Amino acid sequence: MARLEVPEREILPEWLTGFVDGEGNFSIVTVEKKSSDAPSISSYKVWLHFQITQHSRDTDLMERIATFFECGGVKKRNIDAVDFKLNKFEELENIIIPFFQKYPLQSAKVLDFLAFVEAANVIKSKTARQWTPE
């Protein structure tokens, strides 16, 4: 059976917020690094990651989302999945966070977003070097 062609439509901010509510992910990634000189001392590398995953048949949609945000990239994960990914701090801080502050998430995912924003504020602050995960 042939797949029906879906007409390309303008991506509206409210639609995109709802889409991310269901399909998006806000991650805070930490990696511990032990000091070779003092094994009892650890440092942490922390970065933020925003991602939307879809079936590979929706690659065009993911590329339109990347165009909408004017940042990030689309990458095929495997034969069946494609990701819109973004982890550049400046783009997260200047594009993604303000977007979801203007067009708030409606599901429990808003709690993930609020933690994401808090982590961004810590990373941006001068005390980021002293931050330890709880």
What kind of region is each of these model predictions?
Residues 1-134:
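Sequence-level preference for short, compositionally simple segments enriched
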